[in-house]
Amino acid sequence: MAYPMQLGLQDATSPIMEELTDFHDHTLMIVFLISTLVLYIISLMLTTKLTHTNTMDAQEVETVWTILPAIILIMIALPSLRILYMMDEINDPYLTVKTMGHQWYWSYEYTDYEDLMFDSYMIATSDLKPGGLRLLEVDNRVVLPMELPVRMLVSSEDVLHSWAVPSLGLKTDAIPGRLNQATLISSRPGLYYGQCSEICGANHSFMPIVLEMVPLKQFESWTSSMT
């Protein structure tokens, strides 16, 4: 999860988030190089008197500044498309969880189990236990098995919401009347926090998400106790 004064991304805990972090660094380096070149050219224009007032055309220069940006865009687009298709792929998920957004809480239904569903509300600051995180703790966590593909089906009962868990690289819009799909795989156990990431009304800031990733045996014990 995030910590005070953090400047970078949250630690990746899924293959998708690792790819997104690498893509961020790749794109940031390209942007940095372009910005440096532009600032260098501007500084030369302001500090020197070298001008070409008689130049009517320069086909070589025009060719370069047409081809070079095209190459740069391709270098950004190809890894971006690769990650996009990776996020969309899911073959034979171990588990499917239906997530519904409400004003202002989340409800979850484990479709592979009979009558396994619950609502997840934020715990008020006055009710937090020692060590609890303000505005991030919930009364019912989403317990999922680690290292197994899980399909999340996301929708909304009322207005637009967005189900987001940054450390897993997830952000899926919850749209009334529409079912969106997200895939998640956690590479290690732990608690992963997120929040609604679409302004949805007065209590938008009070819709936290908590995923508890556990080993498969522990997950099966939890489902047995819940059903």
Swiss-Prot record:
The keyword Transport applies. GO terms for molecular function: copper ion binding; cytochrome-c oxidase activity. Mg(2+) binds at residue 198. GO terms for biological process: ATP synthesis coupled electron transport. PROSITE patterns: COX2 (PS00078), COX2_CUA (PS50857), COX2_TM (PS50999). Its main location: mitochondrion. The keyword Glycosyltransferase does not apply. GO terms for cellular component: mitochondrial inner membrane; respiratory chain complex IV. Cu cation A1 binds at residues 161, 196, 200, 207. Its cofactor is Cu cation. It is found in: Mitochondrion inner membrane. The chain crosses the membrane at residues 15-45, 60-87. Its EC number is 7.1.1.9. It catalyses: 4 Fe(II)-[cytochrome c] + O2 + 8 H(+)(in) = 4 Fe(III)-[cytochrome c] + 2 H2O + 4 H(+)(out). It comes from the Eukaryota. Residues 46-59 are mitochondrial matrix. Residues 1-14, 88-227 are mitochondrial intermembrane. Cu cation A2 binds at residues 196, 198, 200, 204. It is an enzyme of class 7 (translocase). Belongs to the cytochrome c oxidase subunit 2 family. Component of the cytochrome c oxidase (complex IV, CIV), a multisubunit enzyme composed of 14 subunits. The complex is composed of a catalytic core of 3 subunits MT-CO1, MT-CO2 and MT-CO3, encoded in the mitochondrial DNA, and 11 supernumerary subunits COX4I, COX5A, COX5B, COX6A, COX6B, COX6C, COX7A, COX7B, COX7C, COX8 and NDUFA4, which are encoded in the nuclear genome. This is Cytochrome c oxidase subunit 2. It comes from Cratogeomys castanops (Yellow-faced pocket gopher). The lineage of its organism: Eukaryota, Metazoa, Chordata, Craniata, Vertebrata.
